[in-house]
Design a protein with these regions (language model features):
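Non-catalytic, usually N-terminal nucleic-acid engagement modules in DNA/RNA processing proteins
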Residues: 1-150
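Glycine-rich phosphate/ribose-binding loops and adjacent secondary-structure elements
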Residues: 148-169
């Protein structure tokens, strides 16, 4: 398992892997799914945010476009390493409502260190053909993002499932 230990260089500092990225909602005024332990770990230097939620929150998005800094606005350290998931898939509607370009624009505006590409999750309940289609579309969106991206952060392609068994397969 030592092969998983690496050091990633990000715009806001070095990151030793493996690493925990708790959802900290630094891009969201509420804390409905921020784990309680995030306040108990004084040196927790990572956070995961949802780029789509930030972009859809018009007052906040306008402030960021006007030059506000997300880390400062939300009261976290400037050295916090932020992973910004695209957030493009809405589980309630099961629709994709963003593009790789819009997602990258948002992720770069909030100065994300690690940027996740737009993806649609896989599921054991789906037929293999449907999951294969989703994987292919995710790959194409990742390639579009890669071809469009010229920033300093790390662009990670996202393909995932609902559970560990789906991910392993």
């Amino acid at each position: 398992m030592l092969y998983r230990r690496q050091t990633l260089s990000t715009p806001h500092g070095a990151l030793e892997t493996p690493v925990l990225f708790p959802v900290r909602n630094i891009g969201k005024r509420s804390s409905d799914n921020t784990p309680e332990y995030t306040d108990e770990i004084p040196d927790l230097s990572t956070a995961m945010v949802n780029a789509r939620s930030i972009r859809q929150r018009e007052p906040q998005w306008n402030r960021i476009q006007g030059g506000e800094n997300l880390r400062g606005e939300m009261g976290v350290s400037q050295s916090t390493i932020v992973f910004a998931d695209s957030g493009g898939f809405d589980f309630r509607s099961e629709e994709l409502d963003t593009t790789p370009e819009k997602s990258l624009e948002t992720q770069q505006a909030i100065e994300a260190d690690i940027l996740g590409t737009v993806d649609v999750p896989l599921s054991r309940e789906n037929r293999e053909r449907e999951n294969d289609r989703r994987v292919e579309e995710n790959v194409q969106r990742a390639l579009t993002a890669s071809n469009s991206y010229d920033g300093d952060g790390l662009l990670f392609a996202s393909v995932h499932g609902y559970d560990p068994e789906t991910i392993r397969n």
